Regions:
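Conserved NAD+-utilizing ADP-ribose enzyme module
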Residues: 1-40, 63-65, 76-84, 90-180
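Short alpha-helix boundary/capping and kink motifs at helix termini
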Residues: 37-62
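Divalent-cation-assisted or electrostatically stabilized phosphate/pyrophosphate-binding catalytic cores
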Residues: 72
Length: 180
């Protein structure tokens, strides 16, 4: 079995969970507490991520959300007050790798292009339809007006798992849980 090193910053209470339960699992409540007033927006995207990631590494039934990790200790969030950093060696088969730059596109309701030519084709399509920028496509005032484009955007999101830039600053990783 092949192993890889991952790093993640978590709340200090996770130490208690790891000691007493033997695992750390991310929960909807934790996302809400961490993201505060923008949690609904992130939870919608995280739900979609879970759906996609489950196709790559099977999600245990009791898990709600994955745990975000860095593939590099240099690129991992540094410890701050009431937070700890875990350095882990885990089976590679349990890791969900994805492109963090492409994930940022998903967070902004953007199209994830196959390449530069695909990006130009998509922008040309938006312009020809009078949509301007795809930021607008998900506005409620455009409901039903651009359904086909919205579907095309959402269908492109699984490309976050197609990693073309292997830089430690681009590649991110998720685990369904951290085991003791």
């Amino acid at each position: 079995m092949e192993y890889v090193n991952l790093y993640t910053r978590q709340h200090e209470n996770s130490l208690y969970e790891l000691k007493n339960k033997g695992v750390i699992q991310n929960k909807r409540l934790y996302v809400g507490l961490h993201m505060k007033d923008i949690s609904d927006f992130f939870l919608e995207k995280y739900d979609y991520f879970v759906k996609m990631a489950s196709q790559i590494v099977a999600k245990p039934d009791e898990i709600s959300y994955p745990i975000w990790c860095s593939v590099s200790k240099d690129n991992c969030l540094k410890p701050i007050h009431k937070e700890v950093v875990y350095a882990m060696t885990v089976p590679k088969s349990e890791v969900i790798y994805f492109d963090g730059a492409k994930w940022d596109l998903v967070l902004n309701n953007q199209y994830v292009p196959l390449d530069k030519d695909d990006e130009k084709r998509f922008e040309k399509e938006l312009k020809s339809r009078g949509a301007g920028h795809s930021f607008n496509i998900f506005d409620r005032k455009y409901d039903e007006m651009y359904d086909d484009i919205r579907e095309k955007i959402v269908a492109s999101w699984d490309r976050i798992f197609e990693i073309t830039d292997r830089s430690e600053f681009v590649v991110q990783a998720n685990l369904w849980q951290i085991k003791e």
